Curated annotation (Swiss-Prot):
Single GO MF annotation: identical protein binding
Residue ranges, annotated region (RCL): 367-386
Alphabetical list of Pfam families matching this protein: Serpin
Organism: Rattus norvegicus (Rat)
Gene that encodes it: Serpina1
Subunit structure: Interacts with CELA2A. Interacts with ERGIC3 and LMAN1/ERGIC53. Interacts with PRSS1/Trypsin.
Keyword Hydrolase on entry: no
Name the record gives this protein: Alpha-1-antiproteinase
Length: 411
């Protein structure tokens, strides 16, 4: 009799909770090739960026009329961790689908780099609140391979929990409670249902809360039009302020580029295309341009209008990642024997959810008043009143934490 297939479950959760600031710096032209690439975690930052762009373009291909928001950091961490328990073509597909070239970087270096990157992101002394977590939920009768347990704990700081998957409601509650606690209540009931033959669950979350150095004044926020498309306009609370910004117009992208730094090591990059140029922006934007923007700051005065918004994205990663070449792990040919030798496993579900809130001050009130000098000449008005793209990156490594596209800030 052929062995039955038990199913593993992979869940991913991500949160971004923003409180705006501005930090302007003068910078000269810098060769991006001169960056210090010595730390271990820098070995994978370029791969993470490649994966972020690949996944973004796949999401645009599926729908160019919907908001997009996801955490490439969360997704790659979870699947890289899963690869530790995979073998043969299953492992090769996962790592190559995550944009790792195994002829250029040894697999051991990939996991070592994730280990150091997670340590960097979770620094307790950082002014930025950025926490990641990885949870392994194992059926109480399932025996995991000791080497797998050891490697995911050492490299990915994961926790292991014994769960009775025969009681699907209780198992679902344990998993959802873990995510809700890790994201400080921002993501609840992530897991709507469990397949009846689930015996293993892998959960990743990322929680981010950043504060702008110079918050917008809430008293200046006014309702204004946001042009979703040529025929659709919605009313949104529009923040505004006059000041000095890291901002310039990029003719290559036909877009305004705005960079806003957080207290700590993170930067938000917003790209506002000219009317009718969104597709051009999406086709032309590269990781090298992003790197150049971060290194070559251009400070100018402007009157900035920016919408308050709260968006989220929930994605079936089985569909998305299959389009990027990761297929075997989801079918009966999957080789996950590095996780358990008790029974064949395959990945039955892969869910990713990310949430973003952006407002004047964020979740913590700002008590400081900031006064800054601006040139006497009339500064330009830059209005983020139509669809735009943004990324939030960890400044030291330029690793993409979150990627998004705002089509309609009211949805």
């Amino acid at each position: 009799m052929a062995p039955s297939i038990s199913r593993g479950l992979l869940l991913l959760a991500a949160l971004c909770c923003l409180a705006p600031s501005f930090l302007a710096e003068d910078a000269q032209e810098t060769d991006t090739s001169q960056q210090d690439q010595s730390p271990t975690y820098r070995k994978i930052s370029s791969n993470l960026a490649d994966f972020a762009f690949s996944l973004y373009r796949e999401l645009v291909h599926q729908s160019n009329t919907s908001n997009i928001f996801f955490s490439p950091m969360s997704i790659t961490t979870a699947f890289a961790m899963l690869s530790l328990g995979s073998k043969g073509d299953t492992r090769k597909q996962i790592l190559e689908g995550l944009e790792f070239n195994l002829t250029q970087i040894p697999e051991a270096d990939i996991h070592k780099a994730f280990h150091h990157l997670l340590q960097t992101l979770n620094r307790p002394d950082s002014e930025l609140q950025l926490n990641t977590g990885n949870g392994l939920f194992v059926n109480k009768n399932l025996k995991l391979v000791e080497k797998f347990l050891e490697e995911v704990k050492n490299n990915y700081h994961s926790e292991a929990f014994s769960v009775n998957f025969a009681d699907s409601e209780e198992a679902k509650k344990v998993i959802n409670d873990y995510v809700e606690k890790g994201t400080q209540g921002k993501i609840v009931d992530l897991m709507k249902q469990l397949d009846e033959d689930t015996v293993f669950a892998l959960v990743n979350y990322i929680f981010f809360k950043g504060k702008w150095k110079r918050p917008f004044n809430p008293e200046h926020t006014r309702d204004a039009d946001f042009h979703v498309d040529k025929s659709t306009t919605v009313k949104v609370p529009m923040m505004n302020r006059l000041g000095m910004f890291d901002m310039h117009y990029c003719s290559t992208l036909s877009s305004w580029v705005l960079m806003m730094d957080y207290l700590g090591n993170a930067t938000a990059i917003f790209l506002l295309p000219d009317d009718g140029k969104m597709q051009h922006l999406e086709q032309t934007l590269t990781k090298d341009l992003i790197s150049r923007f971060l290194l070559n700051r251009q400070t100018r005065s402007a009157i900035l209008y920016f919408p308050k918004l709260s968006i989220s994205g929930t994605y079936n990663l089985k569909t998305l990642l299959s389009s990027l070449g990761i297929t075997r792990v989801f079918n009966n040919d999957a080789d996950l024997s590095g996780i358990t030798e008790d029974a064949p496993l395959k990945l039955s579900q892969a869910v990713h959810k990310a949430v973003l809130t952006l407002d004047e001050r964020g979740t913590e009130a700002a008590g400081a008043t900031v006064v800054e000098a601006v040139p006497m000449s009339l500064p330009p008005q830059v209005k983020f009143d139509h669809p735009f793209i943004f990324m939030i990156v960890e400044s030291e490594t330029q690793s993409p934490l979150f990627v998004g596209k705002v089509i309609d800030p009211t949805r």
